[in-house]
């Protein structure tokens, strides 16, 4: 959409499982993604919204799970997902100091959405993830407002940009400009095609550790740029969406394997890195309505999950690579230049 090329255009092919039609998380039917990039008055931040299913998420409540590798983060809403195994709002990503403001906007959005369906809500669990974009964005000014969140939600569609957009506008990954990235994988089972996709907000890692398809690309870049005080800190938000029928317990198993994709790009999950995974399946729902009825869901056979694990790992690895390759060079708040990966990869 912005004319940039994905990591495959540079000759790198992540894994062996086929990708979806657009190689995006929105290859999963019903999933939509929207951005609002905030660039007024020197700000370089924003909001990215992931809508997990068609219709009212609060009413439908897709099965969901969460997993944290290193908990240096301020993500909102994960406690209830852990307890109940469902998600009841879209997932919004932003910067660290705007979690509260985005959460408030997401509550208001959900109230209005439910009012349109003649539902009066008393409790809402807004889900908001974050990374710290203060190297590039004046984060203390907390520039994100309600209308930015609503714009991201209302603009959500199957086609969306990657790189320096939305919540990825000000992120730094492995000493290079990070951003939003996505990828997907498909499998055929019992006569049906299923899709799993990943979306990341990359803001982690040391330049020297960056790996692309097993190649020490970051080390080669570091020999050219000579980074100072390189640390494995920052964060990454990883969203996994699928239409594979899974239970919340199975989803957590998938999220744990998604971490393989993060490690393969060079993360050592340092002290200051928040590594948070949120997953959902829009094949299974546990709605609150119909309290006098038993609820049932379908589940993938446990002994057939190996391929699903690999789908998650490959999707995350490629999504991180795409977040870097779609990004463009940026100047930080202290004047430092953050180069982009595409500067160092021959086409």
Question: Where in this protein do the model-derived segments appear?
Answer:
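Alpha/propeptide regions of enzymes that mature by internal proteolysis
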Residues: 1-347
